Amino acid sequence: MTFSSHTKDILFSEINRMDLERDNFSKRPGLDFSRNRKLGFKDLIRFQISMQSGSVNHELMKYFCYHKDTPTLSAFYQQRRKLSDDVFQTLFYRFNSHYPPICYKNKYLLLACDGSSFSFTRNPKDLDSYYDPNGRSVNGFNQIHLVALFNLLSQRYLDAQIQPIRKKNEFLALSNLIDRFDPPPGTSPIFIADRGFHSYNVFAHAIEKGAYFLIRAKDVNTKRLLGNDFPDTDSFDVTVNRILTRTQSKKKHRHPLLEDQYRCICKAVTFSYLPDDSDAEYPISLRVLRFPIGEDSFENVITNLPEKEFPSMEIKSLYGMRWGIETSFRK
């Protein structure tokens, strides 16, 4: 059996398994999908994941081999409304569970995170995703933003967050992906991301999860983080200790001798581990690296990977692997 056939068999077996548990994936258990219909639970799932770029009517005709009794568009919409919101997420997780991850150094999971926007069926009533007519579209269009988690060595997507384009928040998306990722026993995830994901809140979520991160940062953010500790060299590898707080009052700081380490997180900025009106403090230790990637160009990365096990050249190599998720979007 070819790999593609084996993969398809696994996918269909999981759909069949969910069909036996369809009450768990129905909005009205015991009522929805209780009658025999041409477009039952199993075919409804298979049809939607096999759809291509044609109209729904045309895709229905293809799926049912142009049979005269092909379900109508209305029938499809009626059946689709019966599905629970988590049905495809559950199928995605169950399907992935059949493929053990490939680890780096027999322990680490290299998980790249990146976002991309996609247009979908025009609906001006969906204000969270709709753009008015402009130079890109005379009729307007709708978009969603997807932030995906991709295993660089296994070449598989493991999870994703979908947001309406007008509520796009990549910091929140990555924090949620970190929180709900459940690594296999004996493994540790390394979340690798581009500079759009650089934030104290993302760093803290990974640390609280017992995970590692490797995230690129702009020059201005690196200098703001390091402050007066920013080395005047083209490359460096330094550890920075910071104490995060919600208050700007030095009188409320618990460690006056470490005043230069304090950074105030204003109320407008999300930080999950400091309530808005709290005097609490959150110490955080970060490793900041800068290395050349060309004659006059450099990269800055922030990580919590241990220096003894991950020297600077290895960090550079690991970050370079992040491009695997960029190319995966185009495959």
Feature names for model-found ranges:
Residues 1-54, 62, 71, 75-83, ...:
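Single, function-defining residue in the core of a domain
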Residues 59-65:
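Short alpha-helical "recognition helix" segments of helix-turn-helix
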Residues 133-134:
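Small-residue-rich alpha-helical segments with characteristic i,i+4
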Residues 109-111:
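Conserved beta-strand elements of the Class I
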Residues 87-100:
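Short Lys/Arg-enriched helix C-cap and helix-to-coil transition segments
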Residues 66, 100-101, 179-182:
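Short, flexible, glycine/charge-rich loop motifs used to bind or transfer phosphoryl groups or to couple energy/partner
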